Amino acid sequence: MKKIIFLLIFLLIISCKKQTPKNYDVGYIETPIGEMYFWLYEETPLHKDSFIELANLSYWDSLSFNRVIENFVIQGGCPDTSEGFSNSPYLIKPEFNPNIKHIYGAVGMGRDDNPEKLSAGCQFYIVHDTSGISRLDQNYTIFGQVFKGFNVLDKIATLQTDSTDTPLNRVSLKVRTLKMSKEELKALGGDSFLKNIDEVY
């Protein structure tokens, strides 16, 4: 009788585990122009964890997209100056992956010119070039990929800027991370990316 009870309990536990939906880590950026959603890759755990930690601390909420170059990138976080990189809370070892490239909407970590190619924990960029930027591959770490909000990316990338590529009208940031199920991802129009997500996670 005890064996039967244990067997039933075991089957119940297995059944509950099977019914638990899988959630995925998603980055979220809110700006005055609109919202963007992007995957956070498991293949770059140091950068992913860093992004999640700073987002949960609301680190970027007082900062902005301070460097905007059409057909290149939009960049935000710590100021795009040597002092800005010096003020980064920490640096991150590179996590290059030959299968993750600088395509349109790729999200990467910025850095200054250092031989180890260490990333500045506070600064990130999003690729705007629809043809991709292959020269950045294996030089800058990508940790995410936009799947919703490309229209927002385009609008920010085409804003009027000054001689330092700073937007004339400040683009403030509110950065968070979300947990989403497949159903929630589909509701946001991410259907075409679900197969890739299953391969990644």
Where are the predicted features?
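Sec-dependent N-terminal signal peptides
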Residues: 4-13
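Cyclophilin-like peptidyl-prolyl cis-trans isomerases
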Residues: 16-201
